[in-house]
Amino acid sequence: MSRVGKKLLEIPSGVTVTLNDNTVTVKGPKGELTRTFHPDMKIKIEDNVLTVERPSDNKEHRALHGTTRSIIGNMVEGVSKGFERGLELVGVGYRASKSGNKLVLNVGYSHPVEIVPENGIEIEVPSQTKVVVKGTDKERVGATAANIRAVRSPEPYKGKGIRYEGEMVRRKEGKSAK
């Protein structure tokens, strides 16, 4: 059996999980998330403990088993604690600011780049060189952070660009003169 899928998922206090066929709705202090899972996966809730079972040991069911358990675990964590992803802007004159709900990036282009977050995603700018993406859905937080990073990915020669907090950029040496 999948090691991840076998793990029992304890539902913390303040979080309610409701099952309707294979649609799981998780409500908590930070919000509500709903997702429909594969009909072959059997999801059960007993005494504040959620389990995911699979019908057979074929390859697809083994893969779905652990994935389903992980996604539900992330939903529970998201509505109770939330997720956040930090980004840093490195480069002379590179800065971020917030205009209403939009994130405005000045990263060396002839124009400022505006990014509008999806519903349920919050963008904070604690300083001109730091951006924090927050939300309840781990996938959407990561995707939004990746979209922001893609505006100006770190380049390997000077290391300029937008990078994740703590990301190490592999540096290259420039051309050597003869």
UniProtKB/Swiss-Prot annotation:
Output the GO biological process annotations, alphabetical, semicolon-separated.
cytoplasmic translation
SUBUNIT field? Part of the 50S ribosomal subunit.
List the protein's name. Answer: Large ribosomal subunit protein uL6
- Source species, please? Bacillus licheniformis (strain ATCC 14580 / DSM 13 / JCM 2505 / CCUG 7422 / NBRC 12200 / NCIMB 9375 / NCTC 10341 / NRRL NRS-1264 / Gibson 46)
Fetch the PANTHER family from UniProt. 60S/50S RIBOSOMAL PROTEIN L6/L9 (PTHR11655), LARGE RIBOSOMAL SUBUNIT PROTEIN UL6M (PTHR11655:SF14)
Record's NCBIfam families?
A: L6_bact (TIGR03654)
Describe the function of this protein. This protein binds to the 23S rRNA, and is important in its secondary structure. It is located near the subunit interface in the base of the L7/L12 stalk, and near the tRNA binding site of the peptidyltransferase center.
Keyword line: Ribonucleoprotein, Ribosomal protein, RNA-binding, rRNA-binding
Family in the record: Belongs to the universal ribosomal protein uL6 family.
GO-annotated molecular function: rRNA binding; structural constituent of ribosome
Per its UniProt record, what InterPro entries does this chain match? Ribosomal_uL6-like (IPR000702), Ribosomal_uL6-like_a/b-dom_sf (IPR036789), Ribosomal_uL6_a/b-dom (IPR020040), Ribosomal_uL6_bac-type (IPR019906), Ribosomal_uL6_CS (IPR002358)
GO CC terms on record? cytosolic large ribosomal subunit
Entries under HAMAP family matching the protein: Ribosomal_uL6_B
